[in-house]
């Protein structure tokens, strides 16, 4: 802003009448007439000539008229007497924010990082069986990997067993396969542990072999005469 303060000493300079001891503000492109009014004019950079802007009652009005013409001729880089209202507001707002932040010392809390690793999140849910989701009230979809149970039959052949029904708390845990010991006799008859079963099988065995007794022969003796 081109403002000049002059202390008048009662002399007449440049057409401005000044009184003793009174400061006068001088604006760019503004002249004061002898009868007390203010004239505004600007130089046209294209035509290299002066452009008359008018006569105003106050020096501030004449200075504003000059600022408007200067922005039209030279754009935003023009030298003016007053800054734009938007520039004043933005400057005052930024200075107010800086002063308030410096006085109070309050800083905005940093944002927590987002959880982007979905595989680790699902893996943790699947490991504890979804207990964390139920405790925190979140809805989760755990992924369960069912493990087979290995059992061995008496003949030595391994068998893989899968639990088709999911039960809480029994995830990824192999289920035992109970194998009862069984004894096999030489004659193919089951010789189990249960005494009732063994007794009944013994009776059946005796009944089966009653009618199939062998011939009592001694090979060291001569055969009988009836043969």
Swiss-Prot record:
Residues 26-83 bind DNA. It is found in: Nucleus. It comes from the Eukaryota. A motif (EAR-like (transcriptional repression)) lies at residues 217-223. GO terms for cellular component: nucleus. GO terms for biological process: defense response; ethylene-activated signaling pathway. Induction: Strongly and quickly induced by ethylene. Transcription factor that binds to the GCC-box pathogenesis-related promoter element. Involved in the regulation of gene expression by stress factors and by components of stress signal transduction pathways. Probably acts as a transcriptional repressor and may regulate other AtERFs. This is Ethylene-responsive transcription factor 4.
């Amino acid at each position: 802003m081109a403002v000049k303060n002059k202390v008048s000493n009662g002399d007449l300079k440049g057409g401005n009448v000044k009184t003793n001891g009174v400061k006068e503000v001088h604006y760019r492109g503004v002249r004061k007439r002898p009868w007390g009014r203010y004239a505004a004019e600007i130089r046209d950079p294209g035509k290299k000539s002066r452009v008359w802007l008018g006569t105003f009652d106050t020096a501030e009005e004449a200075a504003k008229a000059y600022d408007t013409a200067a922005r039209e001729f030279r754009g935003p880089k023009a030298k003016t007497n007053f800054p734009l209202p938007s520039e004043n507001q933005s400057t005052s707002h930024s200075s107010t924010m800086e002063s308030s932040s410096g006085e109070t010392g309050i800083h905005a809390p940093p944002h927590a990082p987002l959880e982007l690793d979905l595989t680790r999140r699902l893996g943790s849910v699947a490991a504890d069986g979804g207990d964390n989701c139920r405790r925190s009230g979140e809805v989760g979809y755990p992924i369960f990997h069912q493990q087979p149970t290995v059992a061995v039959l008496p003949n030595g052949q391994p068998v893989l067993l899968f639990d088709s029904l999911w039960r809480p708390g029994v995830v990824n845990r192999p289920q035992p396969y109970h194998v009862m010991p069984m004894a096999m006799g030489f004659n193919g008859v089951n010789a189990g542990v249960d005494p009732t079963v063994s007794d009944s099988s013994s009776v059946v065995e005796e009944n089966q072999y009653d009618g199939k007794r062998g011939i009592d022969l001694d090979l060291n003796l001569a055969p009988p005469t009836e043969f």
